[in-house]
Amino acid sequence: HHRIKNNLQGIMGMLRTLDHQHPQLHQPINQVIGQIHSISVIHGLQGRADADRVRLCELTCAVAAGIESLWDTPIHVDIPTPWQACRISPTEAVPVALVLNELILNAVKHGGQAHQDVQVALRKGIQADHIHSTIAIPGQWPVAPIPPRGGQSLVSALMPRSGATLLRTQDADRAVLRLEFTPPVIHLESPPSP
């Protein structure tokens, strides 16, 4: 996993060089760098002793930090304490990372960067093994449905068929995406022994 992460970081370096040589391509190159970073994060988290234990909370923080740095936009991630961690199924780790990347990046591009305000929160659902990840920015959703394009099409293609749902809501003056994860995509970790 460490070698894969290093190789992906090398690719990101080459893309940054290309970005400096072709400033007119800045936005699409940054988008690709962000996607590669999200995959790299997975391999970094899997490079630990327990390779199959990628935690949703750690992945969310790492993806948000990467986008925050790349797009120079503050992203506030709120995870309550105490928090019982859940791990992502190994087969879903890369798709979940890319979905989180696309949703947070879209929030940055569609108002979060202009307002310097992107809020990401993890909360327990009604059942113990359900987790809600919300991404909120100032503004209103358009009245008419938006046809899928770009990042939205990628999200639709990568969303797990079972164990993940995406819902758009309006919370006063904030446009909110609620991503709910359930088994088989996530599994609660056992609480540490006393």
Walk through the language-model features, giving the residues of each.
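Conserved short strand/loop->alpha-helix "switch" segment adjacent to the catalytic nucleotide/phosphoryl-transfer site
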Residues: 1, 23, 65, 69-116, ...
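Conserved phosphoacceptor histidine of two-component systems
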Residues: 1-9, 13, 17, 102
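Short acidic helix/loop segment immediately C-terminal to the autophosphorylated histidine
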Residues: 15-27
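Short beta-to-alpha transition helix within the HATPase_c
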Residues: 30-41, 45, 52-69, 73
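Short beta-strand/loop element within the Bergerat-fold HATPase_c
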Residues: 117-129
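Conserved DxG motif in ATP/Mg2+-binding regions
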Residues: 131-140
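ATP phosphate-binding glycine-rich loop and adjacent ATP-lid/helix-beta elements
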Residues: 143-170
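C-terminal end segment of the histidine kinase catalytic
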Residues: 181-194
